[in-house]
Amino acid sequence: MGHQQLYWSHPRKFGQGSRSCRVCSNRHGLIRKYGLNMCRQCFRQYAKDIGFIKLD
């Protein structure tokens, strides 16, 4: 079995490796609440466009 056959061959159906940001495909700092599926950096960038407002 060569490297090409083994690389990323394990099924990723659940867990952190199965989910990624819909904008930048990052896997860290993911916000899944309300079905956002965005990393926190992209959420900060697009929050106003989505309709989130910052409360004091």
Curated annotation (Swiss-Prot):
Lineage top rank: taxon: Eukaryota
Associated disorder: Diamond-Blackfan anemia 13: A form of Diamond-Blackfan anemia, a congenital non-regenerative hypoplastic anemia that usually presents early in infancy. Diamond-Blackfan anemia is characterized by a moderate to severe macrocytic anemia, erythroblastopenia, and an increased risk of malignancy. 30 to 40% of Diamond-Blackfan anemia patients present with short stature and congenital anomalies, the most frequent being craniofacial (Pierre-Robin syndrome and cleft palate), thumb and urogenital anomalies.
PANTHER family referenced in this protein's UniProt entry, alphabetically: 40S RIBOSOMAL PROTEIN S29, SMALL RIBOSOMAL SUBUNIT PROTEIN US14
Outcome recorded upon mutating residue 31 to F: In DBA13; results in reduced protein expression; results in pre-rRNA processing defect
GO process terms (BP): cytoplasmic translation; translation
Effect of residue 50 to T: In DBA13; results in reduced protein expression; results in pre-rRNA processing defect
Intracellular or extracellular location(s): Cytoplasm, Cytosol; Cytoplasm; Rough endoplasmic reticulum
Record GO terms (molecular function): structural constituent of ribosome; zinc ion binding
Pfam families: Ribosomal_S14
Annotated positions of the Phosphoserine modification: 9
Keywords assigned by UniProt, alphabetized: Acetylation, Cytoplasm, Diamond-Blackfan anemia, Disease variant, Endoplasmic reticulum, Metal-binding, Methylation, Phosphoprotein, Ribonucleoprotein, Ribosomal protein, Zinc
Binding annotation for Zn(2+): 21, 24, 39, 42
Binding partners and assembly: Component of the 40S small ribosomal subunit.
Details of cofactor binding: Binds 1 zinc ion per subunit.
Lineage, opening ranks: Eukaryota, Metazoa, Chordata, Craniata, Vertebrata
Keyword DNA damage: no
Transmembrane segments: none
Family as reported in the entry's similarity comment: Belongs to the universal ribosomal protein uS14 family.
Protein's UniProt keywords contain Transport: no
Main location: cytoplasm
N6-acetyllysine modification, residue list: 48
Reported function: Component of the small ribosomal subunit. The ribosome is a large ribonucleoprotein complex responsible for the synthesis of proteins in the cell.
Gene: RPS29
CC cofactor: Zn(2+)
Modified residues (Omega-N-methylarginine): 12
GO cellular component: cytoplasm; cytoplasmic side of rough endoplasmic reticulum membrane; cytosol; cytosolic small ribosomal subunit; extracellular exosome; focal adhesion; nucleoplasm; ribosome
Record-given protein name: Small ribosomal subunit protein uS14
